[in-house]
Every structure is written in C-alpha cells, then in structure tokens.
C-alpha cells in the first residue's frame, strides 16, 4: 500500500509519515464517503501500517490485496463480492483504467463503494513535484474520473513540521533544489496539501452518495 504520496528513502519516509495530515482529515473523509466503520474494507497494494491502523481505529475490518498480477496484469487478488469498500491510496487507479474499474466491480458487493485517493494540487506541496496529471487533467469534468461516474471530495490538509527550521531541513534533504525553493517561502511550519478522493457506488446503492466538491 502507498502509505504516503511520495516514495522516499526510509529515513526520510519515516519523517514524512510524521508530517502528513497529522490532523487525520484523510481517514475522516474516507469514513464520511464510505463509510468504513463496521464494513469489510479491501485496501489495494495493502500492508500493515499507518493507514491500515487508521481504518481499524474507525471500525473497519481491513483486508489487503495486490492490484496487479505477477506479469503486471490488472487483477485484484481478492474473491468476487468480498468487500463493501475498496480503497486505493495513491498507487492504483492512475487514470481510472477500465480494467481497474471492472476489477473493483467484481470484488465489491452490491452497493459497494470505491474510494480512490490521489493528490489534487493547487497547494504548496505540488511545487515540490513538477507537473503531474493528478494536478490537472484527472480532476477536470472531462477527465478520466468525473466522466466515468465518479464524484470528487477535496480534502484540505497540511504537512506540519515541528518548526520552520525543521521544515527547511526536511525539504532540502528530501527534494533538493525544489525543496529549498519551497522552503525559502515558509512563513510558518507547514505546507498546504490538497487531496482528492474520487468516489463512486457500484450496483444497487441503497442510499444517495455523499456530496463532493468538483473544480
């Protein structure tokens, strides 16, 4: 499972895990859009860690599945109709490929929910990473998610540092020149960080979908 939106060396990764969304807005949004409490939740590319524990703390029964087979083919390693909610955290559904949608439909029970987390951009963190499709095309009304029946909820989070000095040191170590450029503009020990949760229901939902916000 992609515990974090960015893959860093282990030491920096541990530091990043203590920085991203310390307020817990992302798991609360997953509960609001699922819900996940008291339900069978399948996390793609799963492993024990921060996100799995956050889901369990909300009352989810968490299971994991690989999103791809040994040859790289799209196949979720889970039985048909085995989950109430499927969650992808940054790693899968990079553009909502039809094969992934079909696999989500297969493993979800009627009325099941698919929640796909990606970065949204329009924030401080996006300046660290350059141009990415999740920062523009994916969230457009004509993009791969919204044109295929998804709604989007934008969650306004932060990367929060212990101090401005701590932020400057981390950003330089993790992101080199781009990090130093962002750090030079720090006025307080945090960066704005926006996350998109694309969500949809499959087959026979018994209640209306939660409202989302679209750009």
Residue spans for each PLM region:
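Conserved alpha-helix/loop element of class I SAM-dependent methyltransferases that forms part
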Residues: 17-39
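Conserved SAM-binding loop of SAM-dependent methyltransferases across substrates and taxa
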Residues: 48-60
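Adenosine-cofactor binding site in Rossmann-like domains, unifying the SAM/SAH pocket
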Residues: 63-77
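A short acidic, Gly/Pro-enriched loop at the edge of an enzyme's catalytic core
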Residues: 74-86
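Conserved Class I S-adenosyl-L-methionine
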Residues: 145-146, 151-215
């Amino acid at each position: 499972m992609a515990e974090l939106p960015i893959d860093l060396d282990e030491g920096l990764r541990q530091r990043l895990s203590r920085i991203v969304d310390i307020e817990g807005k992302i798991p609360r949004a997953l509960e609001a859009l699922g819900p996940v409490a008291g339900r069978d939740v399948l996390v793609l590319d799963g492993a024990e860690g921060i996100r799995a524990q956050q889901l369990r703390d909300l009352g989810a029964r968490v299971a994991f599945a690989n999103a791809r087979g040994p040859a790289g083919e799209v196949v979720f390693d889970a039985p048909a109709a085995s989950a109430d909610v499927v969650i992808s955290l940054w790693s899968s559904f990079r553009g909502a490929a039809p094969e992934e949608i079909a696999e989500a439909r297969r493993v979800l029970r009627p009325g099941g929910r698919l929640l796909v987390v990606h970065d949204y951009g329009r924030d401080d963190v996006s300046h660290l990473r350059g141009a990415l499709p999740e920062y523009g095309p994916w969230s457009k009304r004509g993009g791969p998610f919204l044109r295929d029946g998804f709604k989007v909820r934008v969650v306004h989070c932060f990367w929060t540092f212990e101090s401005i000095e701590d932020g400057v040191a981390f950003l330089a170590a993790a992101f080199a020149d781009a990090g130093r450029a962002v750090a030079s503009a720090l006025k307080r020990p945090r960066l704005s960080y926006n996350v998109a949760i694309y969500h949809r229901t499959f087959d026979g939902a018994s209640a209306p979908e939660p409202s989302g916000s679209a750009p």
